A protein has these predicted regions:
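Bacterial N-terminal signal peptides
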Residues: 6-16
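Active-site nucleophile elbow and catalytic-triad environment of alpha/beta-hydrolase enzymes
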Residues: 170-192, 203
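Conserved strand-to-loop "acid loop" that flanks and positions the catalytic carboxylate
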Residues: 110, 198-205
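Gly/Ala-rich beta-loop-alpha elbow adjacent to hydrolase catalytic centers
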Residues: 89-94, 98
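Active-site glycine-rich loops that stabilize anionic/oxyanionic intermediates
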Residues: 36-39, 92-93, 116
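Flexible "cap/lid" loop of the alpha/beta hydrolase fold
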Residues: 106-107, 111-152, 156, 179-182, ...
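Conserved loop-alpha-helix segment in the C-terminal half of the alpha/beta-hydrolase fold
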Residues: 203-229, 235, 248
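Active-site catalytic motif of lipid deacylating hydrolases and related acyltransferases
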Residues: 24-84
Length: 259
């Protein structure tokens, strides 16, 4: 067993003990994690053990990334399988998905991780036009079937620039091609208007402008933390992200927003 692995193991274990011991008892036990574009459920691999050690039941969906409606339907199925109230967590494009799927009655809280948070009637392409294009956007390439991928250069320099190089290259190699049509899907409900929200701003994000993330968080009146992270804080700062999700599980489930 390598020294690097042992260091990571004990660091994650210590973080889990800290999270589990911190604060009030859990009000919600179920957490559904929704990945973003060019990713899959394994993007939560560093957060899941921390949440489980805190006593939470975790499901990470595997969305097809074929359309917003397909991804919402997949996420709703995961929500329906839970045995009680749910905290719904979305990363990046996954914020579009949880904004729509979050209207499900079982969902009692929403956590956005460097994620889009549209209003009803908006598509991803409608968001952020008032800000300069993020650098990583220039590294997105379409294929002949209309699916999008990020170049290896884009992943290394703009998607996950604060991860070890080996992890960055794995993300580039395993990314899920995303149908461009998914970015044109409009949400019909903005669940964040009715349910408690939390937001992780990634201040070094090069895929979504950090100021746009701050704008989303402010519009939702979300409990917000800001991390000096790339676009993937759940991989570069898993302890901080897990701690916020645990907070949501402890504080959700008793009221709707504004009550």
């Amino acid at each position: 067993m390598s020294a690097r692995f042992l260091t990571l193991f004990f660091a994650l274990g210590f973080s889990a003990l800290t999270i589990a011991a911190d604060g009030d008892a859990m009000r919600v036990r179920n957490v559904v994690l929704v990945h973003g574009a060019w990713a899959d459920g394994s993007s939560w691999a560093k957060v899941i053990p921390l949440l489980e050690k805190a006593g939470l039941n975790i499901v990470a969906v595997q969305n097809p990334l074929t359309s917003l409606s397909d991804d919402v339907a997949t996420t709703k199925r995961a929500i329906a399988l839970q045995d009680g109230p749910v905290i719904l967590v979305g990363h990046s494009y996954g914020g579009m998905v949880i904004t729509e799927a979050g209207a499900e009655p079982k969902v009692v809280g929403l956590v956005y991780v460097a994620a889009f948070a549209p209003d009803a009637g908006q598509a991803l392409g409608d968001l952020g036009k008032e800000f300069p294009p993020p650098p990583g956007g220039a590294e997105v390439r379409p294929d002949s079937a209309g699916f999008l991928k990020i170049t290896t250069k884009g992943v290394v320099e703009s998607f996950a620039q604060d991860l070890p190089m080996q992890e960055r290259r794995v993300l580039a190699a395993t990314q899920g091609p995303t149908n461009a049509a998914a970015f044109g899907g409009k949400v019909t409900n903005a669940a964040w208007k009715a349910k408690p929200t939390w937001y992780v701003v990634a201040s070094n994000d090069r895929m979504i402008q950090p100021d746009l993330e701050r704008k989303f968080a402010e519009a939702m009146n979300a409990k917000t933390i800001e991390l000096p992270s790339s676009h993937v804080p759940m991989l570069s700062r898993p302890g901080d992200v897990a701690k916020l999700i645990v907070e949501a599980a402890k504080k959700s489930g008793t009221s709707v927003k504004g009550k």
